[in-house]
Amino acid sequence: QVSVMPVREAVRRLAAEGALSISSSGRIVAPSLTNEKIEELASLRALLEPELASKALPRVHNALIDKLVLINSTIDQMIAKKDVIGYIKSNLDFHRTLYLRAQAPITLALVETVWLQFVPTIRALYEDTPRSQAPNYHRKILSTLRVGDEPGLRLAVRADVTNGLRMLL
């Protein structure tokens, strides 16, 4: 028999991180995002994620680039299958795989907290208006990684994260 305490603790943690809301009656819901909140989250991503990518760049190697190419192919497959959850998971996996190389766990934890807050809204948006093709930003990120172009990498990551969230406004 499994105790409900771990579930309760997980729900409390997600609520503390802004991914869930708990009403006074105990009802649990994914909070809807206002335009102001979306803009704030987009600003945070635009600040933090290019920094993580930049810190990761000196530790990028061919095997990592190959892994990112594979993840990007999975993103294309998820879009073709109209698998919204698979698309979101693969997209976040692409970013997380790169950012882990930054060896900046505190910054990565902040970024993941931001992701938690907007994923339910993105899921609803993509279910209403599914993508027909993958955005080109990941390809730009990959090309900058291949040549070690740090300013280009920062720009590509910033464009990727801000344009993705701009769809929500």
Label the model's feature ranges.
Residues 1-58, 63, 165-169:
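Short linear motifs at protein or domain termini
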Residues 57-58, 103, 127-128:
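Short helix-capping/hinge motifs at transmembrane helix termini and TM-loop junctions
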Residues 9, 49, 83, 91, ...:
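Acidic active-site catalytic centers that drive phospho-/nucleotidyl reactions
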Residues 25, 48, 70, 133-136:
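Alpha-helix N-cap/N′ positions at the starts of helices
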Residues 30-33, 56, 79, 122-126, ...:
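Short amphipathic alpha-helical segments at helix-loop
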Residues 37, 41, 62-123, 136-143, ...:
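Conserved amphipathic alpha-helical segments that form helical-bundle/coiled-coil interaction surfaces
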Residues 15-21, 113-114, 130-132:
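Mobile beta-alpha loop/short-helix "lid" or hinge segments that flank ligand
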